A protein has these predicted regions:
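Domain-level signal for soluble alpha/beta catalytic cores
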Residues: 1-922
Length: 922
């Protein structure tokens, strides 16, 4: 009987295949090959849609699988990376997506079975790509709440794809090139549903791609935050692919190997793309690097991504032969939560304070702001809580006059674009389950659901618990059942024990993901039966810690002092005393105001005695004495207030950040780098008196800030959400300056120039292009965005009809380089000489110098990052600067061509010498 993948991986290192796209390019396929007879009349360009070859040239795909199997691959990956409706919509082939997935799996299954033996079984991994859209980021910098793709749509598309892959014979599901963990969650969710429907145990293989030198995903998460996000799921393996070669990828693989409780996979590119978009690593140079992974015990699965072929895989198989595989880490013994960063709830954390102020039921100010749709100011409340030390931010939108689902989605989407807030996990708080699920579908990190209970019985309770697990969250469990809210110690522990058994035994929830709320209730209310509420909570906390292993305890602390509304000092002092005692007994979460000013150790001894008598219910007259104390303090505060007013005391101003002490130019630059728009209006008004023209402010301090952003992003010290935030700040600055700029202009034009943006034909990636478009628009350029997969003919036509001043070409994949040359050729043929700016992951200055500039009479300039575009565009729009720039580029390109020729000559001489070497053993 054939061994399963789960069995084989325990004994040896598994060999995965290499790149599919690289291999397909070697066949020199043309448009007709992709179309076949079936798609001969479909509009648009089909070349580059590799997945459709499963239907039109299955012989090519089977041949590629065969080559990898012959090279020693244990797992071959289906040619279905983009076989989802979302991805195929770019080609108008949505209705063929399922068939592509089905046939892709069948082709791979047929090839694998032909080579599979009892000694060396071969497996098929169904490839599931991330699509070219993201659930976690806005496509519109001016509207951070917007999303181009929602979780529910993506889930349904993935469900269709994965069902087809399993039907076609896939042994496992490989969710690869993950750049947004929320997209990955949808794929995991769909895989688990297919497993339930089919009764199959489907290994879930997760492969992430990091986008910068800091090791973050494109959506901003660190690798340990990603691990936390998926920690509730039955992941088989986790690893990295794409972005880097083996050498650059190694530190991140080490990080995963040291933290992940899963098998580790790595399939790097054949090095980094060279100046021509190719890859310089060979099987012989890559194998030793892969050998380091293996010898250091870092990996269980090894393969190749962009630029690798069957020759690489053959070398890897030789290198891995007989070597010991990586031993996965133990499952974490502490709770993992995450936003953009990990929150590991270790004993050292002691207490997780959950910020309570983003709650429409608990903050009148927050409610007012949400009702007014003043999200910008509402966000500052969340930001202040994090700055004050909140480790989690609670969000509640339950108000009768609000559309709670829509407001929850909107606010969570907005704070996801604020890195200084999004770094911490969120607590999605609602009494309505549809609001909870709406929130869960917006969050890429591992959040907390607040809450579920047995109020409606076990069936509803278990259904809600399964939803929590489906979305990979932790959960607050209220001590509330069919009989009502638990108010005594006995009822609290009865409900907690029952709920714990149901969650761990019936739905298999990890106890570490369970947070009990034994109900913090108001004390000192004047009703004797309420006096022991705090004591019973603390006793229940101790019992839960001793009897329900792994579980945590939380509570809404402000409920305790409800009777003393209006006297903040007494309320905060009560909370401090309560938390001091509850934390000692095991309370490790609490919904609190992180800006509280009263600490337990700062309370005067005489006050502390009264407060502890109340909280611990030590004396019958404690409540009366606390009321007297509250009155005394209130009178003292009023006297101080009246005295200050009579003496004309100046209002205490809010502390300003250090950078606010700099001159206005420096403040503007720093505000951009930090993405802080709060002071923009006042700073620009001051700058208008210091600079001759409004546009000088853009070209001076604002562009200085954007340059710094570009440099920080380039060296991995900023990540994409931060860059987008700075772009949004820039846009606000430009909007403030716009009336002044228009007033300065003599001819009434309202733009700095018109730029035509396009991702070239054959490439469906648009994130980089979108960022450039935003940055250009922020710098007062009119942007005509043609989208993705744009043929050269359309670019030329639009350049003429739109009277563009320049063209921006974007491309992420290697074939895009050839297409950029084609665009320049078509521009030249049409008699156009508009400046062309090119950018994207595979582009380079050397490629421009060697391939594009020589065939185009206009200026062609390579742009390293988004922040450089407006700087270059400014030079192109100034006739004198443009001529000077053209001369600089001509000289630079001539020098690069000479360097390249000299390098090639040196290589040629080396090859000649090797071929003429003396054969001593002939």
């Amino acid at each position: 009987m054939k061994q399963t993948l789960r069995e084989v991986i325990k004994d040896r290192i598994i060999i995965l295949d290499g790149a599919m796209g690289t291999m397909i390019q070697q066949y020199g396929l043309e448009e007709d090959d992709f179309r076949g007879y079936r798609y001969r009349n479909v509009e648009g360009m089909m070349k580059g849609n590799n997945d459709m070859l499963n239907l039109t040239r299955p012989d090519v795909i089977e041949d590629i699988h065969t080559k990898y199997l012959m090279a020693g691959a244990d797992i071959i990956t289906t040619n279905t990376f983009s076989s989802q409706r979302i991805s195929q919509a770019d080609y108008g082939l949505e209705t063929s997506a399922r068939e592509m997935a089905l046939e892709g799996a069948r082709i791979a299954r047929k090839a694998a079975d032909r080579y599979s033996t009892e000694e060396k079984p071969r497996f098929v991994a169904g490839s599931v790509g991330p699509t070219n859209k993201t659930c976690s980021m806005s496509p519109d910098v001016s509207n951070p709440a917007a999303r181009e793709l929602d979780y529910a749509t993506l889930y349904e598309d993935y469900l269709e794809q994965i069902e087809a892959l399993v039907e076609g014979g896939a042994d496992a599901v490989l969710i690869e090139t993950v750049f947004d963990t929320l997209n990955a969650k949808a794929a995991i969710d769909a895989t688990m549903e297919v497993g339930r429907r089919t009764g199959r145990d489907l290994p879930i293989m997760l492969s992430i791609t990091v986008s910068d030198l800091a090791g973050r995903t494109l959506s901003g998460q660190t690798l340990d935050a990603v691990l936390a996000s998926v920690s509730s799921y039955p992941i088989f393996s986790v690893g990295l692919n794409c972005s880097f070669g083996a050498d650059q990828m190694k530190p991140f693989i080490k990080e995963l190997a040291h933290h992940a409780p899963y098998y580790i996979s790595a399939y790097p590119n054949a090095g980094l793309p060279n100046s021509l978009g190719g890859y310089d690593e060979t099987p012989e140079t890559m194998a030793p690097q892969i050998g380091e992974y293996i010898d250091e015990g870092l990996v269980n699965i090894i393969g190749g991504c962009c630029g690798t072929t069957e020759k690489f895989i053959a070398k890897y198989a030789e290198t891995a032969e007989g070597k010991t595989p990586h031993r996965p880490q133990e499952k974490p013994r502490t709770m993992w939560l995450s936003g953009l960063e990990l929150l590991d709830v270790t004993p050292d954390v002691r207490f997780v304070n959950v910020g309570e102020r983003c709650n429409v039921a608990g903050s009148r100010k927050f409610l007012r702001l949400i009702k007014e749709k003043n999200y910008e100011e509402a966000v500052t409340i969340a930001r202040k809580q994090v700055a004050d030390g909140a480790l989690v931010v609670d969000v509640n939108m339950d108000d009768g006059l609000l559309d709670a689902r829509e407001e929850m989605r909107t606010f969570l989407n907005i704070i996801a674009s604020e890195p200084d807030i999004a770094k911490v996990p969120v607590m999605i708080d609602s009494s309505k389950w549809d609001v909870i699920t709406a929130g869960l579908e917006c969050v890429q990190g591992k959040c907390i659901v607040n809450s579920i209970s047995l109020k409606e019985g076990e069936e509803v309770f278990l259904s809600h618990a399964r939803d929590v697990m489906r979305y990979g969250a932790a959960v607050v469990v209220m001590c509330f059942d069919e009989k009502g809210q638990a108010t005594t110690y006995e009822r609290r522990i009865e409900i907690a024990g029952r709920a714990y058994r149901l969650l761990t035994e019936k739905v298999g929830m990890n106890p570490l993901d369970i947070i009990f709320d034994p109900n913090v209730l108001a004390i000192a209310t004047g009703m004797e039966e309420h006096d022991n509420y705090a004591v019973d909570f603390i006793r229940a906390t101790e019992w839960i810690k001793q009897n329900l292993p792994g579980a945590h305890i939380s509570g809404g602390v402000s409920n305790l002092s409800f009777s003393f509304r209006g006297n903040n000092y007494i309320r905060e002092a009560m909370h401090a005393v309560f938390l001091y005692h509850a934390i000692q007994k095991g309370m490790d979460f609490g919904i609190v105001n992180p800006a509280t000013k009263v600490a337990y150790g700062d309370i005067p001894a005489d006050q502390l005695e009264i407060l502890e008598d109340v909280v611990l219910n030590r004396k019958a007259d404690a409540a009366e004495r606390l009321i007297e104390l509250a009155d005394q303090i209130k009178q003292q505060q009023e006297a101080l207030k009246n005295g200050a007013a009579a003496g004309g005391a100046a209002a205490v101003s809010k502390a300003q950040p250090e950078w606010r002490k700099e001159d206005v130019a420096k403040r503007l630059s720093t505000a951009l780098v930090k993405g802080v728009a709060e002071y923009m209006e006042e700073d620009i008004q001051e700058a208008l008196t210091a600079f001759p023209k409004a546009v000088d402010i853009i070209e001076g301090p604002l562009m200085d800030g954007m340059n710094t952003v570009g440099e920080l992003f380039g060296c991995g010290k900023m990540f994409l959400p931060q860059v987008v935030k700075t772009a949004r700040t820039m846009k606000k600055a430009v909007a403030i300056l716009q009336p002044y700029i228009e007033a300065d202009k003599k001819e009434g034009t309202t733009t700095a120039g018109k730029v035509l943006m396009a991702t070239v034909k054959g490439d469906v990636h648009d994130i980089g292009k979108n960022i450039v478009s935003v940055v250009m628009a922020c710098n007062n350029y009119e942007v005509i965005d043609l989208g993705v997969m744009v043929p050269a003919e359309q670019i030329v036509k639009k350049a003429v009809t739109e009277k563009a001043d320049m063209i921006g070409l974007s491309g992420l994949i290697t074939p895009s380089l050839e297409e950029m040359v084609n665009v320049a050729t078509e521009m030249e043929r049409a008699g156009l000489s508009l400046p062309i700016m090119v950018g994207g992951a595979t582009t380079s200055e050397m490629h421009v110098a060697l391939k594009i500039a020589p065939i185009y009479s206009g200026i062609v300039v390579w742009v390293k990052d988004a922040a450089q575009n407006p700087i270059i565009a400014q030079r192109l729009m100034n006739p004198e600067e443009k001529a000077r720039f053209a001369k600089e580029l001509d000289e630079k390109y001539a020098r690069l061509r000479e360097e390249y020729a000299a390098h090639q000559k040196k290589l040629s001489s080396l090859e000649t010498a090797r071929s003429n070497r003396l054969d001593l053993f002939g």
